[in-house]
Amino acid sequence: MLILGTSLANQVHASWQTYIMIIIYFTILLFIGYYGYKQATGNLSEFMLGGRSIGPYVTALSAGASDMSGWMIMGLPGSVYSTGLSAMWITIGLSLGAYVNYFVVAPRLRVYTELAGDAITLPDFFKNRLNDHNNYIKIISGLIIVVFFTLYTHSGFVSGGKLFESAFGLNYHWGLLMVAFIVIFYTFFGGYLAVSITDFFQGVIMLIAMVMVPIVALIDLNGIDTFKQVAEMKPTNMNLFKGTTVLGIISLFAWGLGYFGQPHIIVRFMSIKSHKLLPKARRLGISWMVIGLLGAVAVGLTGIAFISERNIKLEDPETLFIVMSQILFHPLVGGFLLAAILAAIMSTISSQLLVTSSSLTEDFYKLIRGEDKAKAHEKEFLMVGRLSVLIVAIVAIWIAWSPNDTILNLVGNAWAGFGAAFSPLVIFSLYWKGLSRTGALAGMITGALVVIIWIVWIKPLASINELFGMYEIIPGFLASVITTYFVSKYTKKPGSFVTHDLDKVKQIVKE
């Protein structure tokens, strides 16, 4: 257990009713995986993108659930508990980023990916958009996806291991393996359809949980006066601006820049039935996100008073939601709330596994086999896609076996990597006729390298100068934008077909 005190440990330890709820939840996921296998895995496009047949509501909640991960239920409440309301800047940045993403990226990406050779992966879209016959952009972008998503996926497995260790007193490694088995099963067999349906189901569970826990906590404490009590305990607890710096606020706000380049999120826009359904998806998706994030912040704030009043010593702030849900609720409801954490974790892992698998298959294996042969070996590529899910999962499990960082930091590193490498390129690809192959490649590589260099060598110098401690997406994003623009200005453009395609995309989106 991550809670000190034997009497408390006995209160928090999961009962048989909790186990029943978790078993029911796992059974539902396995059934959905089987359903997805029977319905829509006849070819690689169906396995990876659901045949572009997903409705607006599944699109909205699957995008939200795959986006938020265990970070929303474990990482964010833990951060608010530790630092106070100033941690809320990240929720503002993310909400704005997601909202802009639905307007700026979603409609054009849905239309353009189908127009550009029916691309089913982001690297495939970049290749077709820039007429990259040498496949350099496809290979490099595919490599970035594999590297950063393996890092991202392993953060999900860390969350799963922590959950079972904290709530069930189970060994961290056994918990990690249990989560891995279930998520690999329904992703391996059910593909994109199963992942999207499970994400929708899990998104509903997550929302209910993020509303229930803070409301019941307030009832258990002093109602709305609890927030006054939290403010009295420490002045920075209820102040957006205290306990942080201008640079700290900018860094948290900058998380929103990453949305335009997250493959597991924007692939949802590619799979929706029609771009005309995106407004419906946006309204539901943003509402879900804002309510969920505010709930997570409320859990963190009420948790400050809750933990103090009950004299609990919390070793790991990221287990706050687990502790509160197990003490405040009947074991059956507590089991449901633990399932919500699993939902958050597994929805993201499955989406990331699928995107990484599609990149390995579409962007590497097909390339090795050759385009002509690729068309004649659909069943072979479907099997390679499934095996890729397994391989990436095994590597991520191996990395997660010895966790040495917080969930928020792990997610932050991967988020910054994608945001710096892909966000500028996605925007330029959808809006700028002057983008060149060389500019795209240079900007993408520069963004990824700056993020890695900042994490490894610059950030450790934050004690010398605060500027070095800024979130790595900021220098990475700026470096990528500047490099892409100036290199494109002085290198050869793809050709007149780009102008034609961009005009056509613009026209279709307006219809």
UniProtKB/Swiss-Prot annotation:
Topological relation to the membrane, as annotated: Multi-pass membrane protein
Sequence similarity: Belongs to the sodium:solute symporter (SSF) (TC 2.A.21) family.
GO cellular component, one term: plasma membrane
GO molecular function, one term: sodium ion binding
Gene name of the encoded protein: putP2
CDD domains: SLC5sbd_PutP
GO biological process terms, semicolon-separated: proline transport
Name of the featured protein: Sodium/proline symporter 2
Job description of the protein: Catalyzes the sodium-dependent uptake of extracellular L-proline.
Keyword entries, A-Z: Amino-acid transport, Cell membrane, Ion transport, Membrane, Sodium, Sodium transport, Symport, Transmembrane, Transmembrane helix, Transport
Gene3D superfamilies noted in UniProt: Sodium/glucose cotransporter
This protein's record includes keyword Membrane: yes
Transmembrane parts of this sequence: 16-36, 54-74, 85-105, 139-159, 175-195, 204-224, 246-266, 286-306, 327-347, 381-401, 410-430, 438-458, 467-487
InterPro entries, sorted: Na/Glc_symporter_sf (IPR038377), Na/Pro_symporter (IPR011851), Na/solute_symporter (IPR001734), Sodium:Solute_Symporter (IPR050277)
Principal localisation: membrane
Signal peptide segment: none
Catalytic activity: L-proline(in) + Na(+)(in) = L-proline(out) + Na(+)(out)
Entry keyword annotation includes Cell membrane: yes
Compartment(s): Cell membrane
